Structures are given as C-alpha cells and as structure tokens.
Swiss-Prot record:
Primary localization: nucleus
Task performed by this protein: May play a role in p53/TP53-mediated apoptosis.
Zn finger limits (Matrin-type): 8-44, 143-173, 303-337, 371-401
A biological process from GO: intrinsic apoptotic signaling pathway by p53 class mediator
GO cellular component assignments: nucleus
Entry superkingdom: Eukaryota
UniProt name for this protein: Zinc finger protein 385B
PANTHER family referenced in this protein's UniProt entry, alphabetically: DOUBLE-STRANDED RNA-BINDING ZINC FINGER PROTEIN, ZINC FINGER PROTEIN 385B
Bias type Low complexity, positions: 189-206
Length: 492
C-alpha cells in the first residue's frame, strides 16, 4: 500500500515540462489537458531538449507525443518514465519557485530603441518600467502657509490663498497685538517726556521766584550785593541737572541788578544754556507726535483694512482698492457726500444732529440723508437706494448722454387719441339725426326741427306697426316742448 501511495505521489507531484508542483490527481489531469502544458510540449518538440532530461530524451519525446495524441497524460503508459527522474532532480524541482525570474541587464532603453527620445511619455514610462530602468522620484515641493496651517498642491493654489480674505484676516489678527505693543511703548515714552517737561516747568517757577527775591534785595540794599551773588550761585548748581527752561529766568535776572560781578560771573554759562535750549525744543515736539497717528485719514484706514467704508466694499489687495477708488461708482459716492456733483444730499427730517455727528466720524457720512439726482430727476431716501440708482442702466445712460428708450406699447398715444376721437364723432353722428318732416305738420316743421334735432330720441320704428295719424301730432296750446316717446316691452 505504501508503494502505491508513493507511486501516486510521484505521478502527480511534479511536472518537469512546466516546473509546477501538483497536489492531486484531478489537478494533474486539469494541468496536463491545459493549453499552457500543451504549448510547452509543442515547444519542446520543435526545439532542443533540456540538459537535465537529456538521458531521457527519446522516451520523453515519445511520451509527450503520445500524451498530446491521447489527450490525457494521466492515463498514458509512458508517463511514469517521464516523471520518474532521479532523486536529485526531484529535490531540485521541489525547491524551485513556480515563477522563474529572468535577469535582464539594466542598460538604458535608449540603445535598444533608436526612437526612444521621440516616443510619447506614456511609451517611455512603459518601456522604463518593463526594462527595469529606475527613475529617481522627484521630491514634491511642499508649499504651505504657516499662518493658516495649510498645504497646497501648486503655486496657483498658494497664490489664490495668499490673495484671499481668510489669510488677510489671520494676518491682521496676528499683527494687531504687535501694533498694540508698539503703541503702548510709544505711549510710555510720551508720558515720560511729559513728566520731564512738567519737572522742568516746576524748576523754572522756583528759579523765577528766587530771581525776583534777588532783584528786590538789590533795589532795597546795595550793601548786601554779596547775598544776591550767593542766591544766584545756588541755582547754578542744579543747572547741571535741570534742562534748558532755566535759561530765560537767568537772562531776566541781571537787568535790575546794578552789581557788575553778576554780569561778569556767568559768561561761560550762556553757551551751555543755548545748547540746552536746542535740546529742550526737540522733546517739546515729541508729545504731539503720538497724537498724529491716532487721527488717521480714510485712505490709510482703507489701505490697512482693504475696505472702502464709503461704498462698503471689501477688497483682497491694494491694486483692487486702487481700481475701486478710480471707478465711477466710488467717485459718484464721493461727490454725493461732498455735494459737488449732480447728486445732492439733504438731511432727513427728524434726524438728530448729534447722531449725525457721531456717524460722520464712524461711517461713510451718508446716513440719515436723502438724495436727489439732478440728471435723472429722482429722489432717493437712503444710501442703499442711491447705490442701486447709480448702478442702474437708466442713470448710466443719462450720464453717457444716450437718448431715453420709449417704453414698449402695442399702439402709440397719437393713434389711440385719433381713433378715440373718430369713434366719438361717429357715435354723435349716429345719435344726433334730424327727425323727418313727415311726422310733423307743415306750419310747425320749420320751428320744431332744430329744437328736436338737438336731443337724441330712440328710433320707434321697431315698436310701431303703422304710421301715426297727424291728429296725434298737433301742437298743444302754449310753449312747444318735446316729449320722449313711450317704451313698450313686448314678449318674444
């Protein structure tokens, strides 16, 4: 039994032709009847026999031919001779992999294909992939925005992001604390300069009071001339520490005093005092400097914020802001605010002046106002309506000087008026017809015709069967008055 099992294993364990390991009889039968096995058998018949099976060449060829003729190689008698190879051959076959790698030289395909450089990039990629020419992958340039924490795939995406409003808002949010710190530092420096100037003013007041005391003593007692000298020398020591404002007080001192040593002692001081004056004139102008940036013009604010407060338009760049400022809409809004152009602004009745004053500083200056366009002769109640009117086709055409287009109507006004007049005349002619004289006697016909013809009366020919006799139509005594005929309602 063991021998039979070993024979069965040898029968369907390995196919030397295809170098494939088989695990069952059914699998071996399917493989030997398959196209790939038969194709390789044909190749072996046409070509040379491998070296490993050279000793078994005649038997193998016979077995292959018989297997191909019979159809199934499992039932052939010559199959064991093909399969029963030496033990070394069996071990090598079992160790081999099902797919054998064919080494190809890694030479560039340019030498193999003469037209390689003129090929399409797709063909080049296929050839490079098949022939194993490895192209070093290019590193992608990572474009990122550190402020918004975003990565981009191309330069165009990055440019669009940098020009966008989200990036601008985040930039402003990061720059605003820096600007606040700078403004705080500037305010601290301004307070320091103010305190220094206040100390200087206090020292000048003390020196002036001392100088007045000295002049009084000089006028009263000339014997005590040494005392003013001492009093004058006392403030000379703080002059080294106190800045320039002491100079005018010192200049005032010597004039009332008659003592010559006072004039002779400070000839070296005025040069130092003049230098101190120049130095003090500069810090005096510093406190005004911080007040200037606080009052910024509208243009500077618009450039910083990229926003036009007059037209209420947000912009992504300075170039767009300049283009907006040079546009006709912005100019007309400016003219409306200033009242220089054809659009005049008037205060709205009921609006408070205080509210207007606060809004003039904050907004566009066009709130709580009504407007009148002199070109189009249109009154507008708000700023939004003014913008709509300025951007309308009617206003643009009037400004450009184009003639007004007539509104579409199926008929003209002249035709309508003429047709209505003709209809009225026809009705009057039909209604106002003179009564024939046959109804009236001869003496009254001439007198009654014009009076009766003025009033329309219905045609009674429909209701009368025969003509009325003349006795009914005789005039009554007194003034003649036309009577309306009776209306008879008859059934159908």
């Amino acid at each position: 039994m063991q021998l039979q099992q070993e024979k069965k294993k040898l029968l369907y364990s390995l196919c030397d032709v295809c170098n494939i390991q088989l695990h069952s009889a059914a699998q071996a039968q399917v493989h030997y009847n398959g196209k790939s096995h038969l194709k390789r058998v044909k190749q072996l018949n046409n070509g040379e026999v491998p070296k490993a099976s050279a000793s078994l060449a005649p038997t193998s060829l016979q077995s292959l031919s018989s297997s191909s003729s019979q159809g199934s190689s499992c039932h052939s008698n010559t199959l064991p001779t093909l399969v029963r190879t030496p033990s070394l051959m069996m071990q090598s076959g079992l160790d081999m992999k099902p797919f054998m790698t064919f080494p190809v030289e890694s030479s560039s395909p340019v030498g193999l294909f003469p037209n390689f450089n003129t090929m399409d990039p797709v063909q080049k990629a296929v050839i490079n992939h098949t022939f194993g020419v490895s192209i070093p992958p290019k590193k992608k340039q990572v474009i990122s925005c550190n402020i918004c924490q975003l990565r981009f795939n191309s330069d165009s995406q990055a440019e669009a992001h940098y020009k966008g409003s989200k990036h601008a808002k985040k930039l402003k949010a990061q720059e605003s604390p820096k600007n606040k710190q700078k403004s705080a530092v500037a305010q601290d420096s301004g307070t320091k300069t103010i305190t220094s100037t206040s100390t200087n003013t206090t020292t000048t007041t003390t020196t002036t009071s001392s100088c007045t005391a000295v002049t009084a003593s000089c006028s009263d007692q000339t014997e005590k001339s040494t005392e003013p000298l001492a009093a004058h020398k006392v403030p000379a020591s703080p002059q080294a520490f106190v800045p320039a404002p002491v100079a005018p007080a010192v200049a005032l001192v010597p004039s009332p005093c008659k003592t010559a040593p006072v004039h002779a002692s400070p000839p070296t001081e005025p040069t130092g005092l003049a230098v101190a004056l120049k130095n003090t004139s500069k810090p005096a102008a510093l406190p005004t400097a911080p007040s200037e940036p606080s009052v910024e013009s509208e243009e500077e604010k618009a450039k910083k914020l990229l926003y036009c407060s007059l037209c209420k338009v947000a912009v992504n760049s300075l170039s767009q802001l300049e283009a907006h400022n040079t546009g006709s809409k912005h100019k007309t809004m400016l003219e409306a605010r200033n009242g220089a152009g054809p659009i005049k602004a008037y205060p709205r009745p009921g609006s408070k002046l205080k509210v207007q004053a606060t809004q003039l500083n904050k907004g566009s200056g066009l709130q709580n106002k009504t407007f009148h366009c002199e070109i189009c002769d249109v009154h507008v109640n708000s700023e939004i309506q003014l913008k709509q009117h300025i951007s309308s086709r009617r206003h643009k055409d009037r400004v450009a000087g184009k003639p007004t287009k007539p509104k579409y109507s199926p008929y003209n006004k002249q035709q309508r008026s003429s047709s209505s007049l003709a209809a009225k005349l026809a009705l009057q002619n039909d209604l106002v017809k003179p009564i024939s004289p046959a109804f009236l006697p001869s003496p009254f016909s001439t007198t009654t015709v014009p009076s009766i013809s003025l009033h329309p009366r219905p045609n009674t020919s429909i209701f009368q069967t025969a003509s009325l006799p003349h006795s009914f139509l005789r005039a009554a005594p007194g003034p003649i008055r036309p009577t309306t005929g009776s209306i008879l309602f008859a059934p159908y």
